[in-house]
């Protein structure tokens, strides 16, 4: 390969690297990267920076759980589910009704919301996705997009467009956690960590770990992984592909069922709240690698940190700008994702 063809094939990557180098050089020349300037900035904004790091990690864990369902569905069924965010919204409304009508704690409601979304996902897969399995890719995308619009408008009819939220009777002041009594919100090195965000992060890590063990250690998980790698080969060794597709789609939607219950204590719900999660989840899946469970968690943490740190260095209205920059860099330099496999 000649030098000219090599440069031509990697022109976009070279331009991106050149742009980063120019920005760094400009900041150095203008004194913005001088040790004294950095020290002054840290003295003024150190607490804000630490708070952004803490919040980014906590939110990133939940993002990872949402993206996990999306990457699982794509890895096995080879379909991008644009209705993922709308299903998250449905899970939030289910949790809201359980809490306001039946006094079911949101963290207990996970045991109801996740199975309910599993059943809803299985029905969608059987009645909507399965008949279109041989359709062109763009038709499948339009199908899931139409499904998302249907779910959003159905929720709008039932609950109207008024944002709804809940306020837990605990989580502020001394809170008995069984093994110990903890005073919330936690204050560590100048950062504030609320109970609801910490609980969401820990539950997300736990559920991600459980799903990872399910995929790695059980016969069902081995069947799912075999189907993702080679459908025809899996069929030849006796695996029921249609059953695996149905279960996998159900597991993917169960992930957003759990995530919906986890975010409701600190996020108001309206019929379109899932759209932002949808966009973020797609970025995470591309960043972490299509079909990679650890990649979804890693991508979620990176995106969560990028969002929160972006607010420190730029106006809050540009919160997603840094996320899309990461998205473009991932597409240019590692299109298979951080932990994905090259096709």
Predicted regions: what they are:
Residues 32-59, 193, 214-219, 245-287, ...:
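Inter-helical junctions in multi-pass inner-membrane proteins, predominant
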Residues 61, 70-92, 106, 134-140, ...:
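Short, non-helical or kinked segments that cap or interrupt transmembrane helices
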Residues 1-33, 37, 48, 229-236, ...:
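Cytosolic-side transmembrane-helix boundaries in multi-pass membrane proteins
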Residues 103-147, 154, 298-303, 334-335:
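Alpha-helical transmembrane segments within multi-pass membrane transporters and channels
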Residues 131-132, 137-217, 244, 309, ...:
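Transmembrane helix-bundle core of multi-pass membrane transporters
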Residues 54, 76-123, 127, 132, ...:
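Membrane-embedded helix boundary and interhelical linker motif in transport proteins
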Residues 59, 189-269, 293-298:
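Helix-loop-helix "hairpin" substructures at the membrane interface of multi-pass membrane proteins
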Residues 2-65, 94, 106-107, 136-140, ...:
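Membrane-interfacial amphipathic/re-entrant helices at transmembrane-helix boundaries
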């Amino acid at each position: 390969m000649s030098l000219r063809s090599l440069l031509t094939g990697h022109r976009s990557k070279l331009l991106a690297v050149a742009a980063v180098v120019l920005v760094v050089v400009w900041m150095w020349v203008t004194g913005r990267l001088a040790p004294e300037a950095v020290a002054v900035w840290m003295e003024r904004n150190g607490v804000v920076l630490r708070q952004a790091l803490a919040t980014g990690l906590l939110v990133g864990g939940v993002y990872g759980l949402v993206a996990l369902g999306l990457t699982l569905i794509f890895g096995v069924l080879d379909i991008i589910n644009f209705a993922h965010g709308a299903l998250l919204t449905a899970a939030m409304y289910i949790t809201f009704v359980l809490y306001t009508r039946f006094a079911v704690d949101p963290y207990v409601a996970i045991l109801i919301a996740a199975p309910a979304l599993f059943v809803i996902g299985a029905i969608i897969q059987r009645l909507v996705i399965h008949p279109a399995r041989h359709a062109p890719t763009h038709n499948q995308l339009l199908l899931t997009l139409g499904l998302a619009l249907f779910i959003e408008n159905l929720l709008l009819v039932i609950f109207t467009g008024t944002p709804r939220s809940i306020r837990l009777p605990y989580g502020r002041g001394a809170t008995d956690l069984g093994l110990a009594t903890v005073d919330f919100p936690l204050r560590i090195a100048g950062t504030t960590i609320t109970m609801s965000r910490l609980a969401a992060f820990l539950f997300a890590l736990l559920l991600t770990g459980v799903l990872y063990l399910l995929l790695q250690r059980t016969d069902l998980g081995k069947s799912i992984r075999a189907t993702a790698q080679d459908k025809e080969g899996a069929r030849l060794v006796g695996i029921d592909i249609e059953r695996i597709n149905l279960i996998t789609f159900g597991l993917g939607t169960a992930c957003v069922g759990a995530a919906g219950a986890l975010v409701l204590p600190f996020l108001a719900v309206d019929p379109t709240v899932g759209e932002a999660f949808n966009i973020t989840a797609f970025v995470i899946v591309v960043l972490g690698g299509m079909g990679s469970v650890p990649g979804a968690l890693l991508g979620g943490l990176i995106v969560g940190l990028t969002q929160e740190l972006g607010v420190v260095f730029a106006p809050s209205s540009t919160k997603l700008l840094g996320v899309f920059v990461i998205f473009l860099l991932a597409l240019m330099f590692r299109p298979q994702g951080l932990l994905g496999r090259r096709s």
